[in-house]
């Protein structure tokens, strides 16, 4: 079974511990951050393509591209994130500034 049910760790643990069902719990965080990045870039999510990698609840956006032109949008996103309201994802923005990459899915998950 593939499950996107939250909370992911508790649901996956319960199913695998108390049943014979083989299950993998997945977080839809990559889709959440895709919408956040698109919003920061004043675009719709279908106008950007992102590549992410990492472990559940601690991934990194490695690439952001314009789906029409193929242009690298990471420099534009870094600039937009630097100008964003201070209350928007402060931990994620600090990690972006420190590492050059934006973590996902959100501050509360990354802080786990």
Predicted regions and their residues:
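Long, compositionally biased stretches enriched for glycine and/or charged residues
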Residues: 40-112
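Internal, well-ordered domain-core segments that constitute the primary functional module
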Residues: 1-64
């Amino acid at each position: 079974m593939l499950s996107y049910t939250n909370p992911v760790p508790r649901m996956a643990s319960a199913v695998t511990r108390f049943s014979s069902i083989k299950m993998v719990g997945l977080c839809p965080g990559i889709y959440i951050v895709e919408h956040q990045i698109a919003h920061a870039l004043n675009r719709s999510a279908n106008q950007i393509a992102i590549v992410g990698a990492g472990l559940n609840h601690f991934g990194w956006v490695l690439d952001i591209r314009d789906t029409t032109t193929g242009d690298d949008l990471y420099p534009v996103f870094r600039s937009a994130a630097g100008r964003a309201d201070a209350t928007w994802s402060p931990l994620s923005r600090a990690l972006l500034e420190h590492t050059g990459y934006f973590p996902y899915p959100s501050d509360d998950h990354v802080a786990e």
